[in-house]
């Protein structure tokens, strides 16, 4: 349900009906975290890989619009729910009004911050609704805190936490990481290469837990996955998140992620 617009009924589907599935089926911190992670993935997608579509849908001429992350990892830009009080906490109203009055990256960062607050409010709403005790709330928060925030993904802070070294060749199979090809054309990366032995000490191991986060979904690198690096912003992406296969990457001389491509088209 990536297409925006619609009326209050669409908002109900985005927020209330979507939350009903969690309400009836989930009773554990792990279930609520799965819902949080899916909604977060949808919002990250709206603000990164689908940013051009998201930008168009946030027309300042329309009424107060909200960005919803849905439990199926998609997103929706629509009006808030009509019922008062709403079944679920509502996201920030009127995100579209500030679109043309701000630098685009600042506007996206603002939406990201409000989205982080909304995601937390929905997760802990479910926690209260299901009667989570102190330990369940702590477990839920710990799992949530293990992911970078939407703001960190959108602004690139998550990526900057650890510098990516180019062209590594020595192997340490226990600490794999993506490796960008070091040729002059900066072609997209092949499946990630392992980590240098010299970086495998305690400090390197600590950084490894936070490094190599996908610029689209925010998830960390897992051994054997195909990743690709944008030659403009130098963010890494799962091939599946940006619809690039290893075969397709072979024929790309300079790869631009969806965010950089759409930004240049609007300049």
Curated annotation (Swiss-Prot):
Major place of residence: nucleus
Annotated site (Histone H3K4me3 binding): 221, 227, 231, 236
- Quick check: keyword Cell wall biogenesis/degradation in the entry? no
The cellular location(s) given in this protein's UniProt record come to: Nucleus
- The protein in question is named PHD finger protein ALFIN-LIKE 7
Task: Please report the organism this UniProt entry assigns to the protein.
Answer: Oryza sativa subsp. indica
List the residue ranges of the region (Disordered): 162-207
Superkingdom in the source lineage: Eukaryota
């Amino acid at each position: 349900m990536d297409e925006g617009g619609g009326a209050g009924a669409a908002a109900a589907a985005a927020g209330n009906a979507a939350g009903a599935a969690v309400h009836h089926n989930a009773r554990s911190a792990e279930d609520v975290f799965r819902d949080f992670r899916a909604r977060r993935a949808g919002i990250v997608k709206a603000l990164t890989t689908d940013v051009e579509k998201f930008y168009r849908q946030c027309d300042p001429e329309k009424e107060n619009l909200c960005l919803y992350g849905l439990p199926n990892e998609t997103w929706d830009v629509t009006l808030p729910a009509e019922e008062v009080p709403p079944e679920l906490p509502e996201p920030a109203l009127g995100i579209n009004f500030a679109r043309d009055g701000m630098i685009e990256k600042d506007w996206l960062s603002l939406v990201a911050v409000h989205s982080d607050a909304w995601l937390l409010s929905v997760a802990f709403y479910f926690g209260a609704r299901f009667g989570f005790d102190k330990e369940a709330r702590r477990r839920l928060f710990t799992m949530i805190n293990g992911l970078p925030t939407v703001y960190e993904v959108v602004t690139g802070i998550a990526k900057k936490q650890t510098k990516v070294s180019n062209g590594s060749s020595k192997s340490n199979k226990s600490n794999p990481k993506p490796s960008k090809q070091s040729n002059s054309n900066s072609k997209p990366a092949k499946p990630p290469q392992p980590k240098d032995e010299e970086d495998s000490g305690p400090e390197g191991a600590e950084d490894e837990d936070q490094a190599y986060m996908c610029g689209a979904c925010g998830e960390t690198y897992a051994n054997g996955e195909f990743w690709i690096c944008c030659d403009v912003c130098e963010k890494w992406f799962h091939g599946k998140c940006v619809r690039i296969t290893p075969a397709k990457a072979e024929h790309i001389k300079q790869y631009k992620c969806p965010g950089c491509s759409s930004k240049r088209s609007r300049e």
